[in-house]
Design a protein with these regions (language model features):
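Short, composition-biased motifs enriched in small/polar/acidic residues
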Residues: 1-18
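Cytochrome P450 catalytic domain signature, combining two hallmark sequence patches
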Residues: 74-88, 117, 162-166
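Functional-site microenvironments in short loops/helix caps that host divalent-cation chemistry
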Residues: 26, 32, 36-37, 99-276, ...
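Short, P/G- and charge-enriched loop/turn segments at secondary-structure junctions
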Residues: 1, 38-48, 198, 278-283
């Protein structure tokens, strides 16, 4: 039995405003991380299963759409922000993709400023990060937007249900539930009648994304936590991190070559859609399978 560390309680005066639009409140509490199913079905880095405590936060109900990306990016460019990529999408309500980790950090700051919140990402000198390669830190007490930690993402994806393979209360997956590459002959828990990309969205050319919110939400009310596009997280990736992860608000290793991405995409199989699955990419990486969504710390 894993002993849970005590969680310090404190009172912080911080203006957070009303319940954010199109965001879902994820309550503070304990949840499990890692592959609790058959250890042989997972990838390296998904063990050991361990309990972590995450403070409360709000998460975007949907992956960031091209429409929202463009609106904030236009605001940002007029105020001195610089991005590595313009971002691409199949349509205005499809998830933006072909954005790297650095783009997402700057975009998060711009969205915070646009809406009147405190930016989370600062440079080493304390200035707000708006351009160039990020080498600063995250102000975790700020009330603005930021990328979720890996622990926050998995807690949210589980939807309040423990011990399940996917972001819903069922251990099987099919095209009625998510936009992914079906392969029922390979995975017994893939029950789609076809072995292919999602037939509703495989219109050429790639990528075969679906509009955000096209599938039913999970128990917390979040859409597309499996499939459509992978989602950038804050953490550096370490294959052995789970063996030494803090129990309270883990935020990943101090450094590393790659950042974590979660959630799988339209091009990946059922194995990648499991909530325990961890991906890693260079922070400069950008392609048609990776997008993001943001969070804000809750009071």
């Amino acid at each position: 039995m894993t002993m849970r560390a005590s969680v310090p309680m404190f009172y912080r005066i911080k203006a957070y405003g009303p319940e954010p639009t199109n965001m879902v409140h994820i309550p503070a509490g304990w949840s499990d991380m890692g592959n609790g199913m058959d250890p042989g079905e997972g990838f390296v880095g998904e063990l050991p299963v361990h309990s972590v405590y995450a403070g409360g936060f709000y998460m975007d109900k949907y992956e960031v759409s091209s429409n929202l990306w463009g609106e904030v990016r236009t605001y940002a460019l007029a105020r001195g922000y610089g991005f590595d990529n313009t971002g691409q999408a199949k349509g205005p309500e499809h998830p933006v993709r072909t954005v790297n980790w650095y783009d997402c950090v700057k975009w998060a700051n711009a969205r915070s400023q646009k809406e009147g919140w405190e930016p989370c990402y600062t440079n080493a000198d304390g200035s707000i990060h708006v351009t160039g390669t990020f080498a600063g830190g995250c102000d975790w007490s700020a009330n603005g937007y930021r990328l979720p930690t890996e622990a926050e993402w998995e807690k949210a994806a589980r939807g309040g249900v423990s011990g399940r393979r996917f972001p819903w209360a069922d251990d099987t997956i099919r095209h009625a539930l998510a936009n992914y590459y079906a392969s029922s002959a390979t995975y017994s828990y893939d029950t789609s009648p076809t072995s292919s990309h999602h037939p509703d969205y495989d219109d050429q050319p790639e990528p075969f994304t679906s509009p955000v919110g096209a599938f039913a939400p999970n128990g917390y009310g979040l859409c597309d936590m499996a499939g459509n596009v992978e989602e950038w997280c804050w953490d550096w990736y370490d294959v052995d991190y789970y063996a030494s992860s803090p129990q309270t608000n883990p935020r990943g290793p101090a450094s590393g070559p790659n950042r974590v991405a979660r959630g799988c995409s339209w091009s990946e199989t059922a194995k990648g859609c499991r909530v325990a699955c961890r991906f890693q990419e260079l922070p400069t990486f950008a392609n048609g399978s990776v997008g993001f969504r943001l969070v804000r710390s809750a009071p």
